[in-house]
Amino acid sequence: MLPESFFLNDDVLYLAKELLGHSLVTQIEGKTTSGIIIETEAYRGPDDKACHAYNYRKTQRNLPMYSRGGIAYIYQCYGMHALFNVVTGSQNLPHAVLIRAIAPQKGEDIMIQRRQWQNKPKHLLTNGPGKVCQALNLTLEHNTQSLTSPQIHISQKKISGTITQTPRIGIDYAEEYRDLPWRFLLNIKKSKKI
């Protein structure tokens, strides 16, 4: 698994790209599931108007962002979807990387069951941040958990591919930060065994 030192880099854009190709692994309720991280978004407080910690805003929900890098920041979006973020950087520097999509690896059958995704297109199983949490069984209970634990961690091994940058999704309110290319997508060649 990646060591805590990996997450302490203060350059959240670098880490959002660097996380691509690593596997996010969960061992929850006796079931192991994992997927290659193929889509991320960087959120850089305090200057990023799309970030929960813009202008050093602190709320009960975003307090994990002010922690030392290497923990999970999981919050509920629209009152129904849990979203998983990797807290990065130094203590009190509120940066996080949203994991937007994974390519299933281990336990795909478990992910299908958790998402009730039988007889549906597999390429849509984990192609959104709420879907990732549901498939990996990540809930608000896992908020602030260390990402160097057996329960939730990111693999050291990395798969390479072509990286594309685009603007982030769903942040029309973020003014001049709306169009910054802080969303990163990894294109893995289909010939590579995932």
UniProtKB/Swiss-Prot annotation:
The keyword Hydrolase applies. Transmembrane segments: none annotated. One of its GO terms (biological process) is base-excision repair. InterPro entries: Formyl_transferase-like_C_sf, MPG, MPG_sf. Its EC number is 3.2.2.-. It comes from the Bacteria. The keyword Repressor does not apply. Keywords: DNA damage, DNA repair, Hydrolase. Belongs to the DNA glycosylase MPG family. This is Putative 3-methyladenine DNA glycosylase. It comes from Chlamydia felis (strain Fe/C-56) (Chlamydophila felis).
